[in-house]
Amino acid sequence: GKNTWRKEAYPYYKANRKAGRDKSGMDWNALFQIMNNVRSEIKEFFPYKVIHLDHCEADDIIGAVIHEHGSELNIGSEKFLILSADKDFIQLQKYANVDQYDPIRKRWIRHDQPAQYLEEHILKGDTGDGVPNILSPDNCLAVGERQKAMTKKRLALYSEGTQNMDEETLRRFYRNKMMIDLSEIPQKYQDQIRAEYNEEKNIGREHLFNYFIQKKLKHLITDIQDF
C-alpha cells in the first residue's frame, strides 16, 4: 500500500527509488494503475487470497503471516513457499515449513544460518532500500555520500552484541532493525494482516471461465485446471 509505515518512521527509506523513476521516462502512474486493476481482478475472480493494506508492503504481509504460522518443526505444519528473489526473506527460513524460490533465475534460495544472515543484514544495511550500515548517518545514501566501511573486524565486534556499540551506533542499529527485521512490523499492522489472511474466502473456480472469455484469454482456458 501507499505511504508505508517504514517511510513514515525513516524518511530516507527507498529515497532513491523515486529519483530513478523520474529519470526513466516511463509513465509510472499508468503502470501502477494497471497493477492495481490486475490485483483487484485477481481478488474478485480468482480463488486466491489477495491482501493489500495501506501503509504495508508485500514484505510485511509475508512476514506477518509466516511469523504467525511458521513452525520450528516441519511436522504436520502448513508449508509456505515464498516466490521471490528478494534475499530479505532469508530470515524467515528459520522456520522449517518455509522455503523460497527465485522465479526469475529458476533456483531455490536457501541459507543454513538465517538468524546470522539477518544479524549481518542489519549491521550492513540494505543499500537497495536506502538503509545504510550502522556506522553511517541516516541520509548518506540519499545524498550520495560514501558509507563508513563495515570491515570484517567491526562486523565481528558488533556481532558479539549491542554492548560494543556507542550511543549513536546503537540508535542506527535499531533504525536498521526496524527497517529490515520482519518481526519488527508494528503490532497494529500485524493484526490487520493476520485478520485479512485468516478471513475465509469463498470464491471458487466457477468465475474463472467467464473471466477468461470476457478478457479474451483463450490460451488460458485450455489450462484452467492449473488455476
Residue ranges and their predicted role:
Residues 1-10:
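Non-catalytic, usually N-terminal nucleic-acid engagement modules in DNA/RNA processing proteins
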Residues 13-16:
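C-terminal catalytic or substrate-handling cores of phosphate/nucleotide-
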Residues 18-222:
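Extended two-metal-dependent nuclease catalytic cores across DNA- and RNA-processing enzymes
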Residues 225-227:
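Short, amphipathic C-terminal "tail helix"
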